[in-house]
Amino acid sequence: HEDPRRQRQMCIRDRPSKVEAVKSAISSVGVSGATILDARGFGSTKGHTDSYRGAQYQVDTNPKAMLQVACKDESVNDIIEAVRSVANTNTIGDGKIFITELLDVIRIRTGETGEGAINGEY
């Protein structure tokens, strides 16, 4: 059951090569801003072999991109579908979407809270 007063934070973790496509996809369903972070992670992909000055070595983490989005509860499903439409390759490493309840948002400059602090001018 969707509650229009509830806010969510979505953390979208995927390959760095998918950032622009994901950013465009979430913008198309009304997301007006996101925080994008470079990260490293490990899981099913188990890292990779790299070389430095001719020497091979094992890297046990992979580069990831994280997009953090604050949104209304009612927008979550649209955002999930938008992300999956551009990021799903049906292979290991496609990433994950984490969704948590967001208790509040406060715009530092104005003191505005809630949905008004998520949307609009920065």
Regions found by a protein language model. Give the residues of each.
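Mid-chain, well-packed structural core segment of small domains
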Residues: 57-92
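Short proline/glycine- and acidic-rich turn/helix-capping motifs at secondary-structure junctions
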Residues: 39-47, 96-110
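N-terminal first-folded block
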Residues: 9-49
